[in-house]
Amino acid sequence: PSLHWAGERIAPTICYEDLFTEELAARFANEAQAPTIFANLSNIAWFGDSVAIDQHLHISQMRALEFERPFLRATNTGATAIIDHRGNVVQQLPSAQRAVLTGEVTGHQQRTPYARWMAVTGLWPLAAWALVVLGLALWQHRRGKLRCATS
C-alpha cells in the first residue's frame, strides 16, 4: 500500500524490490490508488565500492521511466538521489558521505501504457512468446538434423 503525504501517494520499496517490475506494476491495478511517487530505502553498505551501487541507481532510473513516476532513493553509503519521472537523476549525494539531500518532487497521476499493461498481464505474455520462439527454433533445428541424416 502507498503512504499518503502532502497529496501524494508514495509507494515504498526496500533494497532491491525495485528490480522486480511486476511487483511495482501490481500497485497500478487500481488507478485511484496508484502511486504518484516511488521511494526506495536501501542498506547497500555490504556491496562495498562496487558496480552494484551504480547498477541499483540505474534500475531505479528505469523504473521511474517505465512508470513515469519520480523516484526517491535513500541509501546509507551512496546513490542517494532524486530521479524525475523521465529517469533523469536531478540531484545526488556524493558516495560514502554523510549528508542530507533536499529537493522538491511532484508526483504524476496518469498511468503509462506500460503500467496499464503490466498491471493486467504482467510478464506472462512475454514469457509465452519466448517459449513459442524457442519451440520454433528447436523444431527448425531438429528438422535440419533430420534432413542431414536422410541425405
Where are these regions (language model features)?
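Solvent-exposed soluble domains appended to multi-pass membrane proteins
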Residues: 1-151
